[in-house]
Amino acid sequence: MPELKKEDSSKDEKDLDMNCPPLHRPNGADLNQYSKSLMEQLQAQLFANPALQFPSFPPAFSIAALTNNQHELKEDDGKKTPTGDNILEAASVLDNRENGSPSDGTNSPDDNGKRKQRRYRTTFSAFQLDELEKVFARTHYPDVFTREELATRVQLTEARVQVWFQNRRAKYRKQERSSTHHPYQAPMSIPNSNGDNPYQMMLSQEAIFAAINQQAAAHLLNEQVRIATSDRRSQSPSVPVTTSSPILPTSVTPTFQNADALNMLFGGITPVTQQLLYVQQFSRAMDAFRTQLLGSVPAGATAEVTDVVALKTEDSKSNSRAGSSSPTPTESSGAAATSTSPTNFADMNSLISDVKPKEESS
């Protein structure tokens, strides 16, 4: 029994340490009532002890809870916004980087004490850019050996050279796309051929007019030859004309060695039609001039000249069909006329006999 008393005393001490009143079971009491009374005692002990009380939480959607959350968010934003001291510290860090940092990066300690590698912009000199551009003009994708050789020549690392070539290729592709696929392309500029020599147009026009004058002079000379031959035939009707003058076409087309000069002469607008109009006008003028010259010649002489021209055209057609390589059809026809007909020799003798008395009388 005394041992039991000791145990009860130890229990009482524990209850005192827990700041709880001792629990006693009444003798002969019901278990249900005992459990109810025990729960009531425990609840009374919990509410009586302030250390064991639970904190009171406001409802989730109450006005006070919402206002408290907004105040907390504003305080967090105020902590995140940089102050003047933080800006000054960042500026000093940037100055230190610019003054004491090499071009290709250094290892700077992080906040946690770790070494972190940082890269900085490389400033290239004019000599380095010149050498890099020369190699880029030769090849856009240099191999490792070329990059190493170039790096040693321009005093850079091979990694810097490789990065420069990557950026340069990207810039080249961007320029190529902008120049080829631009929605508003500039109109193609017409090259000015007179930029180097301002007198080129004047010289070309002078050449054109000289060619026209040359053709007109040749035409007039041929007309004079025909008139002279017709006069001689009128004096001696039995002697055929054996001159080998070329047959003139009905329309004279001047030849131009430089087509660009002709285009410049007519302003560059539809040069073909302008040239045709000019040729037609020129041929009409020459035809009118020919008719005026032939109008002053007697009718018999013009008929004989037309007969000779018809004979020449027939001889030329026959020679072209036979495929003969005679120099000119007029010369062959003239030679045949003088060699075959016996009357020609008699006419020549009569002409010579007529000329000798005239020379003796003179």
Swiss-Prot record:
Keyword annotations of the record: DNA-binding, Homeobox, Nucleus, Transcription, Transcription regulation
UniProt feature, compositional bias: Polar residues: 99-110
Region annotation Disordered: where it falls in the sequence: 1-34, 92-118, 174-193, 313-362
Taxonomic superkingdom: Eukaryota
Alphabetical list of SUPFAM superfamilies matching this protein: Homeodomain-like (SSF46689)
GO annotation, cellular component aspect: nucleus
InterPro entries listed in its UniProt record: HD (IPR001356), Homeobox_CS (IPR017970), Homeodomain-like_sf (IPR009057), Paired_Homeobox_TFs (IPR050649)
Pfam families to which the protein is assigned, alphabetical: Homeodomain
A biological process from GO: sensory perception of touch
Ranges of Low complexity composition bias in the record: 322-343
DNA-binding region per Swiss-Prot/TrEMBL record: 117-176
Disulfide bond annotation, renumbered to this chain: none
Comp. bias (Basic and acidic residues): 1-17
Reported function: Transcription factor. Involved in activating or repressing transcription of genes in neurons. Regulates expression of nuclear hormone receptor odr-7 and LIM homeodomain protein lin-11 in AWA and ASG chemosensory neurons. In concert with lin-11 and forkhead domain protein unc-130 plays a role in specifying AWA and ASG cell fates. Plays a role in modulating dendritic morphology and functions of AWA neurons. Involved in regulating GABAergic motor neuron development, acting in parallel with nuclear hormone receptor unc-55.
Protein name: Homeobox ARX homolog alr-1
Originating organism: Caenorhabditis elegans
Lineage, uppermost ranks: Eukaryota, Metazoa, Ecdysozoa, Nematoda, Chromadorea
